[in-house]
Amino acid sequence: MKILLLAGNTIRSNSYAQYLVSNSFKIEGLFYGFHEIEYEAPQLNYETKHFFIKSDLMLPDLEMGIEKVFDNHGRKYHHVEEHDVNSKNIINQIQAMGPDLVIFSGYGGQILKKEHFDLNIPYLHMHPGDIPSEKGSTTIYYSILNRKSCTVTAFLMNEKIDAGDIISKRIYCPPTRNVNIDQYYDNIIRANCLIDALNAISQKRDIVSFPLKDKSLEYYIIHPVLKNLSILSLDNL
């Protein structure tokens, strides 16, 4: 299976790349917007490091840029000097590369348009919520408040937001107090679920379609007070 990582210059893309090469997946990269967005490695504090050691989840070296990750493991990548993921240049490049599967890891707020799906190539996305019941933004914090756990859903995208055929779901223990949720926890649990999803695809596990009558709630960017309450609800390490 020929896998393409369609990636912006983000911590999530870097996390995906390191999980993919660590699990020996043969991938190519199509990197876009790197000329506009500079990568900044996040600080790693004690609580974050020890949480992932205790959880037995691989902690990527986010000091290393994604290009270095690809170079070190002999993976090919191409750059497109476009920030708009829906640009004709990017879509034409994807078509020319001819992947069997695209892993989408774009910039925040970007939504793929119809032209991507007209390529008839499946696009895989990892959503930090229990689809179809938890859609939208900052669902991790709502999950912590509502159920004291976090789910990642891997699904094949379509033109609807946070909708498509479900490939895999993984439930994770919530982070402990002072773990870096936005930069480490969110991206690492998504990367971990990505590997499970690719294994599911290769093993031809059953795909679950979304219910026709979707009664899910749409979550929007969480209010700072609610976000703080969810953080305060976390246990100490």
What spans do the regions from the language model cover?
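One-carbon transfer enzymes
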Residues: 1-237
